Design a protein with these regions (language model features):
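Structural detector for internal amphipathic alpha-helices that build alpha-solenoid repeat scaffolds
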Residues: 1, 19-34, 52-67, 77, ...
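Amphipathic alpha-helical scaffolding segments comprising HEAT/armadillo-like alpha-solenoid repeats
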Residues: 1-12, 33-47, 66-80, 99-112, ...
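Short terminal alpha-helical segments
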Residues: 6-14, 23, 155
């Protein structure tokens, strides 16, 4: 590997222009897969002080087998990046890594409780995309329905749609969110998710009917969407409600 070329590519990881960073990242991923020299240089760069960005280096190293603890920590830290596209690129990579390195799942679960608002949301989406069916990750999502930040609660409510375990617990928690949450976006997300899983309870149907007839346009819209979903899935339930 030409040393000058490698030095230039690694220097581009500090460039303020994202297309330049992406081009360097794409080249370095291919080179690092074939060269121990490149991987070693990148691992050294990851721990050097004084650089503008560290996530591009971690992103490259995260594509290699058995990424180091420093790489994983940097990727997790980057879930709080100010730019959404970078956060999403990182969480998708973490999901890929988690399929062979199961310890990542526990780190995502920890972030659901202890991370920043951005980290919590991205960790929730990561758990969602892993399509898990275990008690610990389910509890992390259910607990996130009570997070102080409404955007985290919305993420949890929408992500519970993918769960195929704990149906009763999921439905009960979503119903409480729909009935009691102070934020309309959370209530809307809970209603739509709840309309997509299992049989609707009488309490849920009553609440939807009341909301669909309310003067609050946001509540009415959310209830109407949920009722339309239920009518497709459970037409008998909706027909019975309308006869009351």
């Amino acid at each position: 590997m030409d040393t000058d070329r490698l030095t230039a590519l690694i220097a581009d990881l500090d460039h303020p222009d994202k297309p330049t960073i992406r081009a360097a990242v794409d080249q370095l991923i291919g080179l690092a897969r074939e060269s121990v020299q490149v991987r070693t240089a990148l691992e050294q760069r990851l721990v050097e002080l004084g650089h503008r960005d560290y996530w591009p280096v971690a992103y490259v190293l995260g594509h290699l087998p058995q990424p180091s603890g420093a790489t994983i920590r940097n990727l997790l830290d980057t879930l709080d990046h100010r730019e959404p596209d970078i956060r999403w690129a990182i969480v998708l990579l973490l999901v890929r890594i988690a399929k062979t390195e199961s310890s990542i799942i526990n780190l995502l679960i920890e972030l659901c409780e202890n991370g920043t608002t951005n980290q919590k949301r991205m960790a929730i989406y990561g758990l969602r995309d892993l399509v898990l069916n275990d008690v610990v990750s389910l509890q992390a999502l259910l607990s996130s329905l009570s997070d102080p930040d409404p955007t985290v609660r919305v993420a949890a409510a929408t992500s519970l749609k993918n769960r195929t375990d704990g149906d009763e617990r999921v439905r009960a928690a979503l119903l409480q969110s729909y009935l009691l949450d102070a934020d309309i976006k959370v209530r809307s997300a809970a209603a739509v998710t709840l309309a997509n899983i299992g049989l609707p309870s009488e309490e849920f149907l009553r609440a939807l009917k009341e909301a669909s007839e309310s003067d609050n346009s946001q509540s009415k819209k959310a209830a109407t969407v949920a009722l339309a979903l239920l009518e497709k899935r459970e037409p008998a339930s909706i027909a019975g409600m309308r006869q009351r």
